[in-house]
Amino acid sequence: MTIKEAALLTGITRQNIRYYEKMGLIYPSREKENQYRKYNKEDIRRLKLIYMFRKLDMPLEEIQQILDGRKDLQEALEQQKEQLRQKQQKLAAALSFCGEIQETELTDLNEIGRAHV
């Protein structure tokens, strides 16, 4: 399977597929005559897993550890859930603060600076 076909099948851009190869997340074979990448079922399976983990905002280093069997999947998912909860709390605080600024009806940047410093 070509990189174009792999991209269509997985929903991952060709650029990202090449990057994942460079990072050592996938290992496509190469055609002898033209050095084109060839993706097999295992490459596609790994790409789909990478796609799923990236949707969870998981770092590539952690994904690699999971795919290589160096990190337990359930443990990684629990850690990621905690990371997402922390991000959610920070975003909620930022949204709340944004609303507070709007409610004060401050229109001048100097006023905002004095009011919240």
Task: Please provide the spans of the model-predicted regions.
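Short, charged amphipathic alpha-helical surface segments
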Residues: 51, 56, 61-114
